[in-house]
Every structure is written in C-alpha cells, then in structure tokens.
Amino acid sequence: MALHLTTAGESHGPGLTCIIEGLPAGLEIDRGALDRDLARRQLGHGRGGRMKIERDKVDVTGGIRHGRTLGGPIALQVANRDYANWEERMNPWPVPAELAEVHLPRPGHADLVGTQKYGLTDVRDVLERASARETAARVAGGAVAKAFLGALGVSVFSHVIQITGVRAPRRDDLEPIDFAAVDESPVRCLDADAGRAMVAEINRLRKANESLGGVFEVRAFGLVPGLGSHVSWQERLDGALGQAILSIQAVKAVSIGDGLEVAGLPGSEAHDEIFYDDERGFWRQTNRAGGVEGGMTTGEPLVVRGAMKPLPTLTKPLRSVDIATHEPAEALRERTDSCTVPAAGVVGEAMTAFVLADAYRRKFGGDHIEDVRRALQAYRERIGWRPR
C-alpha cells in the first residue's frame, strides 16, 4: 500500500490544501504537533515581512475524528491571512477591476519557463504556485507522516550546517536528544559559535541587498533495516529521498551520508565496516553511507542533506526581459526573504518523513495501526533486529 500526498493553493490565494491518502486507521494525531511544525517552518533569521502576517494553523476537513485517523484520505487546510490584502488580485472568480499583468520574470525562478509551458501572459499565474509558500501544506502533511513514524519508533529532525561560506563543525555522534533545543537558535544551528557567525553573515549580505543559500541536514532515528529495495530502480529509497528533497523550492543538490565527500576517497576509507555481537546484532562503527546501502536502510541513522541556492527574488533585481515587449528590463521586485535555509530544514523533515512513511506502508501494509505494528514486530523478530 502506497502513501500519496497532494497539495493545492497559491501563495496569496485563500489558502493551501494538503490531501494524504494511504494511512491506516487508529493513528493518534495531535493537532498541537501539526501547528508546532507549521510555526517552526516560519522560524529563522533572515525571514521577510510576511512572517509577521501569517500565523499558520491547520484545519482538518476530513479523515480524522476525535484525534484518530479513519483510514480514508486526510484533508488539511492552512489559511493565508495575507489573502485579505490580495483578494482582488487573487480571487478565484472574475473581478470587475482591470488588473495589470506582471511581465518581468526573475532569473532563477519558474516565471519565464512557466509562462512559456502553459501559454500564460501573466507571470503571477506561475509565481503564485511556484512560491515556497506551498511548503506550508507539505509541512502539515509531513507532520501527519511523522505521527505515523512516531507510532513505529521513528523520529525525524533537522538542523542547519551551512549558510554561504559559514559552516558548522561536523557532528557524527548526534542523537535525538541533541535536537531538543535546535529551534532556539535563530538559524536552527546546533553549534552556537557557528550560529552566531551565520546570523552575522545574513545581516552583512542583507544590507548589501543580497540573498543567501546554504545546507540543511535531516536525520532519522529508529529505522528498521530493509526499507526500500535493491531489485528495481523505482524502489531504491535513496532515489525517492533525492527526488523529495530536490522538489523543495530552491534546493539544487542532495546528498546521503558523506555524499560527494566519498568521491575523493579510496574505497578502504569510503565504506562502513560490518560487525556483529549478540547484544546488538549487526552494526557499523561508522555511518558514511548515511544509513542507506543498495537502496535500502541499514538500521543506522538516516542522514540526508539538501543544498539550497540563494533565493532568486532580490531587492536589487537582476537583468531580465519584458515578456510582452521583449525589451530589456529589471526583474520583478516582490516581497521576499533574505535567507530561508532554517525553514527549508523543516520542510526537509516533512519530505523525508513522507518518504519514510511511504516505505513503511509499502513494506508492512495494514488497515489499522495495530496491524502495522504487528507486521513490523514480526519482521524485527525474523531478522533479529533490535532498535538502538
């Protein structure tokens, strides 16, 4: 049984919708946990003025009754409070006023190619859906996926490891407890010194009318070995994770484990040697593979990184062309953030959680959450694996 997640809605439209299909009945859902993840997505030094307007909360319109899933599609909605300021321009129905079209595509955004592909004359018809505001719906859905994983002993976290050239020291020994206070950092960085340097870098480049990119890392703990498969490229878990992380707006690269770093190492230094003892079963001293070998989880923590480019909406616009007149012009000026890497980490959590939840559904099936637990326990006993 596969899991499906679909979102709908525009950045300044009435709201965003997320529909999740494939979760079992009987799963407990905490509305507060969903709202907390939505609030976490709005965190981070370098956010723009819209974060002062939106106070995202989730409304459930189907699939959950009295805090438990029913087994059918789950429908979630997140209202756009800013729609009150855009109602005329973003109304789903015709309005009497004649509205000026936007003809100035931004380099690095979906604007130009979107108008070409869909035969549109107004860039706003593209940018509203392409906006990262859409990820609020994904985070809401990802929070439901995290609830499912949590019921199976799996936890998912994220932190920022780099903003422009400022990088936090590498940590290979992270445990779930280490993430308890990550959201107290203004850039969601676990290293206090690096976090302060990142804040200073954001301030410096924001004054120069620049935007900033960086790298976030997602870690998942408690995963059973064998999620995914080696037998078909479509079933390889690392392929699904790569697609999910790359689908996040402005993410340009993804790595699992040491990723590109192992390309520069000899084979004897690139892999994780295997050990066995009666207490732990099979185990590895290192985790260069990031918890995935041959397209399958190994039982070690999953480590996924996403590299985000600087946002393409700039307060000092780049050169562009008016799509109506074909004359040179500056790109569109639009309200924007300077840096959203901390928020992207929260979105990365949601997307990773969805992929992992889908992998558990495909492997263990079940119409009720207790069916899933029993199937998981039987599998653990068969392979002799104990959660660490």
What are the residue ranges of the model-derived segments?
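Generic N-terminal targeting/processing segments that precede catalytic cores or assembly contacts
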Residues: 1-388
